[in-house]
Amino acid sequence: MSVIELTDVVKRYQNGEEVIAALDHVDFQADRGEMVTIIGPSGSGKSTMLNMIGLLDTPTEGTVHLDGRNVTDFTEDELTEERRSGIGFVFQDFHLLPMLTATENVELPSMWDTSVDRHDRAQDLLQRVGLGDRLNHRPDQLSGGQRQRVAIARALINEPDILLADEPTGNLDQDTGETILTELTRLKEDENVAIVAVTHDEQMLEYTDSTVRLVDGVVTEVSGR
Amino acid sequence: MSVVDFLWRFPSVQMAWRNLGRNKLRTVLAALGIIIGVVSICSLGMATAAIQQQATSQLGSIGNEVSITSGQDSDTDGVTDDQVDTMRNLVTDAEVVPQKTNSTTVSSRNGREVRVSVTGVTNAAALYNLTSGEAPTRLLSGALLSNSTATTLGIEEGDPVEYDGQLYRVQGLIEEENAFGFGGGELVLPESALSEQNHYNVVTIVAADSATATEIGGELDEYFNTEDEEELSINTFGNAGQVGGFLETLSLALLAIGGISLVVASVAILNVMLMSTVERRGEIGVLRAVGIRRSEVLRMILTEAALMGALGGLIGVLLSLAAGLVIFQMITGDPLGALQWSGFQYLVYGFGFAVVASILSGIYPAWKAANDRPVDALRG
């Protein structure tokens, strides 16, 4: 069973008089232990699609299933709970909080859960992404690649089923980008997590299990399945 | 576990503290507004407390008295013997002291003259304190003279004073503790010295405290007077009377002025919180995206505002305490008066107001940030 599944999803935006369909009858699915890449030119609806998969946005039409449950009509608070327990995010420009150390940034998603102590897991994750000697550094003391690895560790802290990455290599040089992709490939197996990445970086296609090509809100090609 | 570790168990406090530390100048400026507000509320409040304390201590000597004179509907030109007897029957728990009054000129041997009021009274002890020794409870011969008059005229204890062709030996000097003065000096003589006056000008009833005095005043008013006819005019100074009312108005006015500065300060906090949440919009979007609940974002930002208020409030209270010590030293001569509840309460109120005003100012920015859709907020 797919961990996340979009069925016939349409997302329309009102732009003045004009109605724009950012996604036009899109189907999508991803399984645990699989990396799916959504690729397409800018403005093709990649980010909108990632927002649907990440339960940050709701579709105008169609349904979203998470782990077999229909979450299409969930309220904002219910969606928050789902994101909290099952989804990890990696953003293009990392989005680490500048006043927190690497460890604290990794702990952030579970910070308000005083019932669990995630401190050890946070340090363990940082060690696994090769930042064992940077635990108490602040983001401004880390390089771009290191920051992205902190962001990946943060996305994994809640033991998610899905890890979403929006242009994970977008702000990194070629070599660092490759290191990050190798890291992600390793983690999807270790953590048995579905990785959905959005990119226009063709380099990513070497690492991915399947690719969804998106043009003007329409899926034009699905490969690798 | 240290206090810091303990506080760190509250994620809202931890996050709020870190956020405040990010832009220290802005935090300090916002807190400065609160500090000024708290200091103005506290020091104005403590100043009125000091004035009130000083005034009550001075009013204390008449606060427990009932003063009775002839009413406007009375047939006689004073209070009669019969009426005094009735009062003595009615009032069992206080001293009834009838007095006859007049005025005269006292002269000294060196020819200097002073106009004084004359009081003929038997129970002088109930009304007067002497510079040394006790005033007699039955003044049958001799006289008492105010200390200042005696000094002016060079009269000492034992010297004679003339009134109405008779000489009276000065038995004691009256200590003038009353700051409100009642004008010049006073000569106190036995009641018999004013025997040509048939009625008493004033009857003073000295009770244990101002509450009892007020009660007695009401009782006598009910007995002697009706709604249309005032046989006796009965005055009490209980509850510090009109002076107290004036001070209350004054203190309210001063607190209102202090309150305005706190309102200004909370508008500054509103502005700072709004700016900082707008600046951090993307960041709050990340928090929401990774599953931080709306209520948790709300709590974090409200805690920021509360911390800022508490910080400003604390510094403000410390400065106000210092100001209070100075104010009390200047007005009452006792700096430690600032630590009594009547003055100290303003520090508690000041701190409370600072925190409450800051939280109120934080509500809108916090609500706005928490309810921003994460997908919109992430775009920054």
Language model: regions and residue ranges:
Chain A
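ABC ATPase NBD coupling module
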Residues: 20, 71-88
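Conserved ABC transporter NBD signature motif
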Residues: 62-73, 224
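Short coil-to-helix segment of the ABC ATPase nucleotide-binding domain corresponding to the Q-loop/switch region
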Residues: 100-108
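Conserved ABC ATPase signature
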Residues: 138-148
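Hydrophobic anchor residue at the start of the ABC signature
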Residues: 152
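Conserved catalytic motifs of ABC-family nucleotide-binding domains
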Residues: 159
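Catalytic Walker B motif of ABC-type/P-loop ATPase nucleotide-binding domains
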Residues: 163-166
